Amino acid sequence: MIDIKLIRENPDLIKGDLIKRGELEKLRWIDEILELDKKWRENLKEINNLRRERNKLAIEIGKRKKSGEAIDELIKKSDNIAKRIEEIEKENNIIREKIDYYLWRLPNITHESVPIGKDDTENVPIRFWGKARVWEGHLETFLEQSQGKMKYETITWKPELHADLLPKIGGADLERAAKVSGARFFYLLNELVILDLSLIRFALDKLIEKGFIPVIPPYMVRKYVEEGVTSFGDFEDVIYKIEGEDLYLIPTSEHPLAGMHSNEILDGHNLPILYAGVSPCFRKEAGTAGKDTKGIFRVHQFHKVEQFVYARPEESWEWHEKLLQNAEEIFQALEIPYRIVNICTGDLGYAAAKKYDIEAWMSAQGKFREVVSCSNCTEWQARRLNIRFRDKPNEKPRFVHTLNSTAIATSRAIVAIIENFQEEDGTVKIPKALWPYTGFKEILPVDKREKCCQS
């Protein structure tokens, strides 16, 4: 939520940012907010004047009572003032509701470094890491996507898509999952179960080393939390509601972690607060019909380790870079080649002031795909959830800044491992960093092994 004081003092800044985001239909909202706010403040001034007048009448009534003078006329006048105050307060409540309607639906103000663009095609790659394995048939598109800034080795055989390789390594059963639950669900099997759990523990260990507190949050939250952390459009497109309950399945542990300190005033000396959330994530994936219909890349349910930070406003941009660095270190340790993308205004989402994505190179698909999202939401979520801090007991509280970033989303990391570490015979090598966690170094095709998890 945006501070109405900022709209009041600098409406052109807000309008300019809405134009950058392509939210042109909301420009008139700013003018309406200003008109409503002006009327609200005029009413408030009148209420205060009427209260002062009524207080004077109360004093006069007291004096006349003592002297035995008539007070009926003064009491009548006082009652009329009280009624007028009540009328204006009701009007102001209606005005406040209208203002809040707009404020709750305005996006965050973007950082000056966010590129202006209409959609994901105008996101800007800013950094590349690793050495990609590139099938010769994908070389031209790879060079275009990597801008010639990434190391690579060419392979002559075409890697299999993860969806095609999954049954060959006994990694998942999507057909039976579709029978039981519908599309975009999966049974994870054999080594991939161990790999999934290993990725969680690996990422968690990395974050614990950096001072993050591990948290398994509630998997359902109340509506006020969802309204506080995300845009209203997500209620239709992303979030599952529990029928008959004021509860929603979490699409990411970011949401319960943001709600964890709602309506609290934090001790500034304890900032930053660093949480590493571990949870399943549940997403409708509405609006993605036809996209990634095979395999486990875009699914309704998956596991994720999430970084979440409550920071001082003056430190939040530094923490944004640190969260990105943490995620990069995880993918570098896994030896998965990637690029960093600065998300443009048209693809940013309402909550974030700036967002980076890490996109892993998918050798079989021949393109980069999102595996990490790293956002600074500044005070947008904190205002909605009323999360403040102060350094001294009598100090006026300030809103914290909230930040979040994927550490690892296991299903997408598994896809990246399968596509980048497969051999021509269908064997999938395990990144060395995971060997102490998995207990095996490769996943053999089903027809080449006797049992699961052979080391």
Swiss-Prot record:
L-serine binds at residues 252-254, 306, 406. One of its GO terms (molecular function) is serine-tRNA ligase activity. Disulfide bonds: none annotated. One of its GO terms (biological process) is selenocysteine biosynthetic process. This is Serine--tRNA ligase. GO terms for cellular component: cytoplasm. Consists of two distinct domains, a catalytic core and a N-terminal extension that is involved in tRNA binding. It comes from Thermococcus sibiricus (strain DSM 12597 / MM 739).
